[in-house]
Amino acid sequence: MDPKLEQRARELRALLQKASIAYYVHDAPILEDSVYDRLYRELQELERAYPELITPDSPTQRVGEKPAEQFPTVSHRIPLYSLENAFNLEELKEWQERLWRVLGRTPEEGELEYVCELKIDGAALALTYVDGLLQRGATRGDGQSGEDITPNIRAIPSIPLRLATAAPPPVLEVRGEAYLPIAEFERINRERCSAGDPPFANPRNCAAGTLRQLDSRVVAARKLSFFAYALHWPEGWPSGDPPQTQWECLQRLKDLGLPVNPLSQVCRGLEEVVQFYERWRQAQLPYACDGVVVKLNSLRLQEEAGFTQKFPRWAIALKYPAQEVPTRIRAIVASVGRTGAVTPVAELEPVLLAGTTVSRASLHNADRLEELDVHIGDTAIVRKAGEIIPEVVGILKELRPPDAVPYRLPSHCPECGTLLVRPAGEAITRCPNPACPAKIRGQLQHWASRDAMDIEGLGEKRVAQLVEKLGVRTVADLYRLTPEHLESLEGMGSRSSQKLVQAIQRSRQQPWERVLYGLGIPHVGVVTAQILAQHFPAPELLAQARAEDIAQIYGIGAEIAEAVVAWFADPAHQKLLQELRELGIPALPRQAAPAVSQVLAGKKFVITGTLPTLSRQQAKAWIESRGGKVTASVSRQTDYVVVGSDPGSKLKQAQALGIPLLSEAELLALDPK
């Protein structure tokens, strides 16, 4: 190989990477488009003639020629949490008050410093760089795991294949948002309409769908963009001091060649946060934006504030006001859910709302019906609750037609005819019949859902057939179905029947936490199921637990604990669990024991400062796995305060109350094993 050719290839790669960073990160192009294209073609021709010159970070290697067959599921080394939402300034103030309490601070100690970032309406991504090279890109998924879509990530031109540094961290985890510029979204929809295809509903849906394309050439053609907003260095920072604030993180991301939204700003106190929010609320931006993300600037205070089951306590999304539209109520139906809750649902004249077509909206309950005085034929004001679920929020009574009909919930279940009940103190009307077909359908659909047993092909229509035609009554019945049973159903042939039975049988291997979530215990969501499964690694152990023991687990509480105990005490549920265990579900030994001793059972800990070797989350997990509970604030009920370097005001509070202090080493010594 001619050394001059190798040198030229290196020069071209370096120049093209520098030009990309100047264009996408600094918005300051250093090359005309025609010059960039000429240099790109020169590198392409060199690599075509001498394939040994091709490197993984070459700009010519962004788009592969061969479509992927599927996207494997991968675990996130660092979870991607959701954000708590605030829909008005009062909720924002309440969040800050909670933050003050968690940090053990008062307003008199000075305003907190925040970083405000525009909340781009796109798809969250997790990027992993190893020794400076892009190794993996994945979707957010459920926050714990997502799909490995690396070929598609490489096709997004603003995401660098190599970090712009000679001394990268050994591993760098980057979080950001892939989005579709509005102009590009409109271009794609024009082309789809011209081709006779239905247009995409909104840029977010288009971006998410594009990222899951099996052919990365489609991704490249749609010209997605990307903004990075977080970074983590799990194996250390290479040289100098690591970032100490969120603002420094954004600057480091930019220095590494990753695009960062230039409209972010440091704000001192909520007054400046509100000014930032108002400044951009009505702005015409080149991308969809649905609010402002407010984050504590100090990384040390972020770590001290910690996380709830779902959200970081140190960040919140201040959402823009929800879009509201009027439309006519054509009918109202009573919908029965898997718990027996009866919800009035308005069937509407279809209307476009927040980028999607809405034809049904919730009326919540009987109290809401009475409060709104809803009539069939009314013109209703509809909005999306939390930007997700359409709901009726008002009635334009001045537009009520003479033939409008008042609506009241039925006295008997529309599915099974059982007299409905409304427990004292509850707003929800319920069907008490455990054999109600609607409840059975809901339970089966929940069991088969993606976050539970993830049974592909077992959707709403198929579940209805199983209940109506084959007499399926419990989730255990699913595992007794054969292809011959299914072939009797409309639309099911030999091949599709075998495929569904295989999907059902595969789900036997799902872990205990998914089974637990799939059981549909009240108040037990995905995260709660994971926590319970960690502490009680078999159904028998959880079934034997007392409510007070369950309530001691960090992140659970009395209401969830009582619901769990009540569920396991029901004879019908005990029978179902026995049937599942006989079927080998969940797939674990019949006798399981806790992995570690419970030497810290009943003890309450508070952590303050930075520990020498353990992160705050690692220390919390260590304590909880041994039966202890980690709380956010110091009180007289606190047993120990674990103190690291640079502690906060919690140290003074502990000293004032005479609470024992522990170093990290003293903490670990509490369990000699």
Swiss-Prot record:
Belongs to the NAD-dependent DNA ligase family. LigA subfamily. NAD(+) binds at D33, S34, V35, Y36, D37, S82, L83, E117, R140, E177, K295, K319. Zn(2+) binds at C413, C416, C431, C436. Residues 595-673 form the BRCT domain. Its EC number is 6.5.1.2. Its cofactor is Mg(2+); Mn(2+). InterPro entries: BRCT_dom, BRCT_dom_sf, DisA/LigA_HHH, DNA_ligase, DNA_ligase_AS, DNA_ligase_CS, DNAligase_adenylation, DNAligase_N. PANTHER family: CHROMOSOME TRANSMISSION FIDELITY FACTOR 18 (PTHR23389), DNA LIGASE (PTHR23389:SF9). One of its GO terms (biological process) is DNA repair. This is DNA ligase. GO terms for cellular component: cytosol. One of its GO terms (molecular function) is metal ion binding.
